[in-house]
Amino acid sequence: MKDILLETGGPKPSSEEWLKKAKQSDDSNKIGMYLVHNGVVRSTSKSSVYEGNPAKEVCGMLFTADKDKAEDAIKNTLLLDGVYYVRVWMADGKLAPGDDIMQVLIGADIRSHCVDALTSLVGKLKNNCVEEKEIK
């Protein structure tokens, strides 16, 4: 099994540095595409974005991550066809609009595997591994 590359808290790491390290990984010769997701806190509430409900503007967020669940999600992503590299950083604590919530890097053999893996992992992290409480 590949190393589980998960970090939480502290400042968001450089995606450029992550890419440099990914390109030096043991399986880098099998990787044809890297994708990075950088989620940030927005000032619009989830209910106004997803449901169209008028809502008070968000002035912050309390964000916590369950590392064990996140590690399981990463392990499962590494089992997907063509996925050879996964790295995740998630914030911790009180965040303001514009602050980074998470960064995810996926390395896979072809575009469709990379896009599918990124979409799947970010969905699992957001829906199953973190708690986001909007501050209004």
Feature names for model-found ranges:
Residues 1-100, 107-136:
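N-terminal, polar/charged subdomain of small-to-medium soluble alpha/beta proteins
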